Amino acid sequence: MYDLKIYSSYIVAAIKDKIVFFSTDGAVLHTITVEQKAPVKDTDAGNEPNGNQTQPTPANVVTFEYCPTAKVLAVSLSDKTWRRYQLREEDGGKLCSAPLGEDITTARTIVSMKFVPKHGVLFGTDKSDCFEFGALDKTSEPQPKWILGHMSQILALAVSDDERFIVTSDRDEKIKVSSYPDCHNIECFCLGHTEYVGGIEIIPSEKLISVSGDRTLRLWDVTEGKELSKLSLKEPALDFTVQKVAEGCGMLCAVRSYVQNMVEVALVSYDKPDASELYDPLTIDESLIILNAGLSASLRLMLLTMEKESKRVRMLVYEFCAEKRAFKACDDHPFVKNFEDQFKDVTIEQVRDYSTLFKHTIDNLTEYFERKKIKMESKKSK
């Protein structure tokens, strides 16, 4: 279990039960270790303790989301609970935190989150449903409220800046744009992908960027569901991270590829869609697997990676060079060393399997025709 996200003031990394806040320059500001539940004593038929203890499911971080305005961190855990932490700045720029309320139990694990600060709520999705939580309400326990669903697995979640639209994408090629808070009112669908839609982001001028397993990156009008442009990627895409470039109306996209050591790079123009273009991809050492990627406002790319043999985690940092239209490695960046110090000898036992997202066609005739062909050829030879 792991995640990496970049906010305006912090870089946040989580692996297993540890969450670390870094400054944008890579300095360590605060660490949170998820408290594990105590073992439960078994009881016999007479409800008397029998001396045995049942170990609870480990509570490791699945994903998290931070709200800068309220300074609240919401964390989804692998034991089907999620927790909140209230953060506070101390002298010297360091942070401290305290649990906020009780653990909230959900029917299924929450796999993606987005804060909606104007409404004071958090959106969270499990496999096929999206829920609303009153995560910023400090006076009550935020029980989940169902707001929308899909017929297949939800893979990505985005919310417009004005909080009028919730956009969700799924394994069955669909991108759904729902009104908020009247989520039963579907504004439109963005249809055109032919494989799972792994990543979506709303950008300025009410535009939407999406990437898919069909090897395409697409730009949409989010209010009408109209496709504005399409770029052909080299490989299927898993997800992406995006930031606005300093000049013009362009968005730099770093697309995490199905090829485990590659990030594809694109510049998407939202005022002149036809001007969008692909740059040369970034390929790292074959001994590493890219687990997650984040792009900062200064166009600094952070890659959370894992060594294939040792399973140890590593952080890689790159700076974008506009003249060369490529990312350049920053091996001496402080974030690299500080990340290593915080997660030294931490290993990832299991990497997420994305092969299950692709369509599987059932063909009952191919084998039959092959056998028939062999049989006919054998008869001719006689």
From Swiss-Prot:
Pathway entry: tRNA modification; N(7)-methylguanine-tRNA biosynthesis
Region Disordered, annotated ranges: 40-59
Biased composition (Polar residues): 49-59
WD repeat residue intervals: 149-190, 192-230
Alphabetic keyword roster: Nucleus, Repeat, tRNA processing, WD repeat
Localization, UniProt: Nucleus
Keyword Zinc included in the entry's annotation: no
UniProt entry tagged with the keyword Repeat: yes
Gene Ontology annotations for the cellular component aspect, listed alphabetically: cytosol; nucleus; tRNA methyltransferase complex
GO BP: tRNA (guanine-N7)-methylation; tRNA modification
Source superkingdom: Eukaryota
InterPro entries with a match to the protein in the record: Trm82 (IPR028884), WD40/YVTN_repeat-like_dom_sf (IPR015943), WD40_repeat_CS (IPR019775), WD40_repeat_dom_sf (IPR036322), WD40_rpt (IPR001680)
Family under the similarity heading: Belongs to the WD repeat TRM82 family.
HAMAP family recorded: TRM82
Function comment: Required for the formation of N(7)-methylguanine at position 46 (m7G46) in tRNA. In the complex, it is required to stabilize and induce conformational changes of the catalytic subunit.
Assembly description: Forms a heterodimer with the catalytic subunit.
Protein's name according to its UniProt entry: tRNA (guanine-N(7)-)-methyltransferase non-catalytic subunit wuho
Source organism (scientific name): Anopheles gambiae
Gene behind this protein: wuho
